[in-house]
Amino acid sequence: MYAIVFDLDQDSLAQTYHNDSYKNAYGDIKKALEAHGFSRQQGSVYFGDVSKVDAVSCVLAVMDLAKSNPWFAPSVSDIRMLRIEDNNDLMPAVKKAVS
């Protein structure tokens, strides 16, 4: 499974986003990545659908995101593609530790 993770510089985003409500940028990103087979896992972490997303589609999704949103490139401070071998939910361990 592939994932895209990123950080946005909030000051830069506030200056470059096309309206005053720059937090809407996260919704724009979500919509763009969903169109390429990704779903939001948490925060700025998106997992690709195993049956649709490979390394090339990660690159194409990010290129499309940057091309269609002129505020994205100047605002993104870090963005990475990750290959995830296992996706294990650790919440049972957390709950067991405090019970």
Task: Give the predicted meaning of each segment.
Residues Y2-A3, D11-S99:
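Basic nucleic-acid-binding interfaces
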Residues F6:
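Active-site flanking residues adjacent to catalytic metal/cofactor-binding acidic residues
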